[in-house]
Curated annotation (Swiss-Prot):
Functional pathway: Amino-sugar metabolism; N-acetylneuraminate degradation; D-fructose 6-phosphate from N-acetylneuraminate: step 5/5
Keyword presence, Hydrolase: yes
A Gene Ontology term for the protein's cellular component: cytoplasm
Organism expressing this protein natively: Rhodococcus jostii (strain RHA1)
Any one Gene Ontology BP term: N-acetylglucosamine catabolic process
Name of the encoding gene: nagB
Name of this protein: Glucosamine-6-phosphate deaminase
The family this protein is said to belong to: Belongs to the glucosamine/galactosamine-6-phosphate isomerase family. NagB subfamily.
Cited NCBIfam families: nagB, PRK00443.1-4
Source lineage: Bacteria, Bacillati, Actinomycetota, Actinomycetes, Mycobacteriales
Length: 259
């Protein structure tokens, strides 16, 4: 696991965009896209590079981490619609090459296995972007999730539904269930890139990177992965015991060694 500490959120977003751009330019790339606030700056930077420098996404494809159950794909709060408005519609990535779990599947219990099979058929994900919750969750893998879990249906906590109600007309409109890639599915991506900002994420980052491997902190499963880059700002790094070493290692990173 490589931990990259940047001074500001904008520097974090730029570094993450550099990583994604490398895969896109080497192409064809299969991207794992996350929603939420953490990757937004990186999406904006990638869109700028497409607009101003011709960064070409036409050969790329993408898989989403999760999707609401029972919400039409066309609904403005489906994660498919959200990722379109935040990123896909701003680059030349064909929406037919962007896949999400089918929250309206007539056989919702089997949809997770179908989605995992689709990822495998595409050759797997090259680079997966991830945020992290204050409790260490990634995707909708809340504390207690099996570290080898596959894409499956999860029940949203009442607090999560209340938190998400601001995006809907009322809390009654927020779905109770979501399809999410499991920790095992996420871990099959060849490169995991975690993004975090602010003191509010500092304890979660410390637990994920330096704490024990435990279902209590789902993101700690990254410790077992062969290629992880955690890109954070100084505030999110404030609880790391080895922060000085991570800064030293980055400063002396060999010129031939990429992220």
């Amino acid at each position: 696991m490589e931990i990259v500490i940047r001074q500001t959120p904008s520097e974090v977003s730029s570094t993450v965009a550099d990583i994604v751009e490398g895969y896109v330019r080497r192409g064809p790339a299969t991207l794992g896209l996350a929603t939420g606030s953490s990757p937004l700056g990186s999406y904006r930077e990638l869109a700028r590079r497409h607009r101003e420098s011709g960064l070409d996404f036409s050969d790329a494809r993408a898989f989403l981490l999760d999707e609401y159950v029972g919400l039409p794909k066309s609904h403005d709060q489906s994660y498919f619609s959200v990722i379109r408005s935040e990123f896909v519609d701003h680059v030349n990535l064909d929406t037919d090459r962007v896949l999400s779990p089918n929250g309206e599947s007539p056989d919702i219990a089997e949809e997770g296995a179908r989605y995992d099979a689709a990822i495998a058929e595409a050759g797997g994900v090259d680079v997966q972007l991830l945020g992290i919750g204050t409790d260490g969750h990634i995707g909708f893998n809340e504390p207690g999730s099996a570290l080898t879990s596959r894409t499956r249906v999860k029940t949203l906590t009442e607090q999560t539904r209340l938190d998400n109600a601001r995006f809907f007309d009322s809390v009654d409109d927020v779905p109770h269930h979501v399809l999410t890639q499991g920790l095992g599915t996420i871990g099959e991506a060849r490169h995991l890139v975690m993004i975090a900002f602010g003191k509010g994420k500092a304890e979660a980052i410390a637990a994920a990177a330096e704490g024990p491997l435990s279902a209590f902190c789902p993101a700690s499963v990254m410790q077992l992965h062969r290629h992880v880059t955690v890109v954070i700002d100084e505030a999110a790094a404030s609880k790391l015991q080895l922060a000085d070493y991570y800064r030293y290692a980055l400063e002396h990173k060999p010129s031939w060694q990429s992220f």
